[in-house]
Amino acid sequence: MDGRRRNPYELTEDTPVYVISVAAQLSGLHPQTLRQYDRLGLVSPDRTAGRGRRYSARDIELLRQVQQLSQDEGINLAGIKRIIELENQVAELQARAAELAAALDGAATAMRQREAAVHASYRRDLVPYQEVQQTSALVVWRPSRRGQSSD
């Protein structure tokens, strides 16, 4: 979650709205196949208070992906389950990497701001360095005698 309140009536791709018969029709599978996939943990829809299954648009897409991997690619259901687990893990890691990159960018910006403030604070206190030319001239100082004025 991003911390913002969401409209409870807003439909997203994760909103569970489809009953099993509609989900089966949308995915092109038999309802019994959906129940089997749920038992195997391939696609786990949300449940109502009465234990009825409710599928989201994301679940429908996953059902289509499972069917494609099984029928077109010839992957068994155990292999498909592992693929789904790995894809979920990759998605979580990518999200975490994005969070860490954003935190790193924020820390780098804060560091640059603090560094600029430090540089600005000591610029007021420092006197620019100027190299003094060395000379071989000799200045003789003679204290004035009392009562005599110097020209």
Swiss-Prot record:
One of its GO terms (biological process) is negative regulation of DNA-templated transcription. GO terms for molecular function: DNA binding; DNA-binding transcription factor activity. The keyword Membrane does not apply. Residues 17-86 form the HTH merR-type domain. It holds the Pfam family MerR_1. Induction: By heat shock. This is Putative heat shock protein HspR. The gene is hspR. Binds to three inverted repeats (IR1-IR3) in the promoter region of the dnaK operon. It comes from the Bacteria. Residues 20-39 bind DNA. Keywords: DNA-binding, Stress response, Transcription, Transcription regulation. It comes from Streptomyces coelicolor (strain ATCC BAA-471 / A3(2) / M145). The keyword DNA-binding applies. InterPro entries: DNA-bd_dom_put_sf, MerR-type_HTH_dom, MerR_fam.
